[in-house]
Amino acid sequence: ENLSFNPLNEPCGFTTEQYARVFGETLIAIREADPVRFVMLDGNHVASEPVPLFFNFKSTGQAFRGYTPHAVSHYRADYIHDQPKGEPSWPCGPGPEDDPNCWIWEQPETTLKKYAWVIGTGYPVMIGEFGCRNKLRHETCLKWMEHCLKLWRDNGLSWAIWNMDGPCGFLDSDRADVDYEDFHGHKLDRKMLNLLQKYMQP
């Protein structure tokens, strides 16, 4: 009875009208089967823009992403072709302000500002995904993660990490610069786990 779900991950290329039609029809069908089931909707444009139309729908919320800036969270990801010239650091990045490859001016706060007014309405909002790929230096990754986690905690936001095990997680992440701890046959990144636990909300 506590199970919720997200009907569509990171809708992209939708006009507001298309988003409203697709999710509106989906919610109607869900409500016919279960009038009170909570449904989390990703914001439009890869979960970066809130859609106010659904604020009046009972038992719904909206999720956005916690990957800003992508040059940090997705550093050297094999599916990202536009990479920064140098390896990112945190909180400073390579390049001057007018350098298009410089990501320092894109902060996690930038994404949060788009949803700040929604949070103020009391409508449920959360960070549906966040994490940092395993090619970034571990120290930099943890600094960036703590920046994000503190920001969200201070704004009363819940969050979900992209994966617990794998390239963004704290188990079997295959990072070259982590002193892993054996945990029931898995390689545990204790520093990352401790950081996440530090900011977990009851």
Question: Model-derived features: where do they sit?
Answer:
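Residue-level preference for long, well-ordered alpha-helices that form the structural scaffold
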Residues: 15, 19, 100-107, 137, ...
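Generic hydrophobic, helix-prone segments enriched in Leu/Val/Ile
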Residues: 39, 108, 195-197
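Short, acidic/polar
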Residues: 107-115, 145-149
